[in-house]
């Protein structure tokens, strides 16, 4: 069986940051890559080229950091948590779960028009600049430089939406996407439903589905004859609760050491995280293997499958698994937000010509 062609995602470099994200934002065509010099050897298909992004996406509203005065004006509750740093800038204590949750609520209100957002104690509190970066890059992936692509007609599936519902919220508010959001935790979906009910701008745009099988990814969620332009996922990172707890402690220790203090008690990570959000049997590698295997069952129903990949060593087994399937295209984007590096792995069973026809049929203005 032939191996998938591997391509790179191209994007323009922004000179200035956009102050706010507009609803149904248009995707600009990426600049054309310079032709390769003669004699240069192209990477082999079994060694995918990884494009590294050392800054946030050019359309990311948080490209220049947090505007705390504007955020406090939009969400006055944030003022309690904002303090000057030794360097004279304003910030919050990122080891304080309540401070981070309040910052998220302020960001969502100021930049994305979400007036009410809350999560249960212990639930995953996502870093919004990094999460919306994923959304922007898969929007570029979907458009493939096609200026006529109507983003607000896209249907998107979020696997494991959690209690925060962050990807449906951002995708709806930035690009006008229609979402199906799934999770194995009914309590998480109940919280997302509450967020939807408290924000009229989200109503009628996000459908929630309970995954009945905690060992499945797409099976039991994607219905017959259903179509999605994109699937998104932030897989559980750890292989056990013990591993997740150790990771939490290590991250908080690093936060405390960066402030010149030490951890005196069992800390809570600012990102939090319930069991299903943090770990699963086999960890990220097994989850991705299941996702890739099941994606073949829905090859003609989903234009692009995508997932975050936190551990670089998990990319190789993913490439190997995709090479065994009839996958046409595999793309990898390595994103960097501060000191954290993560990757978007994307694959499609449709050829470039078929993807163009798909967009013309379903996403034309």
Curated annotation (Swiss-Prot):
Pfam families listed in its UniProt record: Methyltransf_10
Cellular compartment(s): Cytoplasm
EC numbers for this chain: 2.1.1.181
Residue intervals passing through the bilayer: none
CDD domains noted in UniProt: AdoMet_MTases
Ranges annotated as biased composition (Basic and acidic residues): 33-49
Catalyzed reactions per annotation: adenosine(1618) in 23S rRNA + S-adenosyl-L-methionine = N(6)-methyladenosine(1618) in 23S rRNA + S-adenosyl-L-homocysteine + H(+)
Gene3D superfamilies: Vaccinia Virus protein VP39
Enzyme kind, highest EC tier: transferase
Principal place of residence: cytoplasm
Region feature (Disordered): 1-49
UniProt GO BP: rRNA base methylation
Cellular component per GO, a single term: cytoplasm
GO molecular function: 23S rRNA (adenine(1618)-N(6))-methyltransferase activity
Keyword line: Cytoplasm, Methyltransferase, rRNA processing, S-adenosyl-L-methionine, Transferase
Purpose of the protein: Specifically methylates the adenine in position 1618 of 23S rRNA.
UniProt-listed PANTHER family: RNA N6-ADENOSINE-METHYLTRANSFERASE METTL16 (PTHR13393:SF0), SAM-DEPENDENT METHYLTRANSFERASE (PTHR13393)
Family classification: Belongs to the methyltransferase superfamily. METTL16/RlmF family.
Protein name: Ribosomal RNA large subunit methyltransferase F
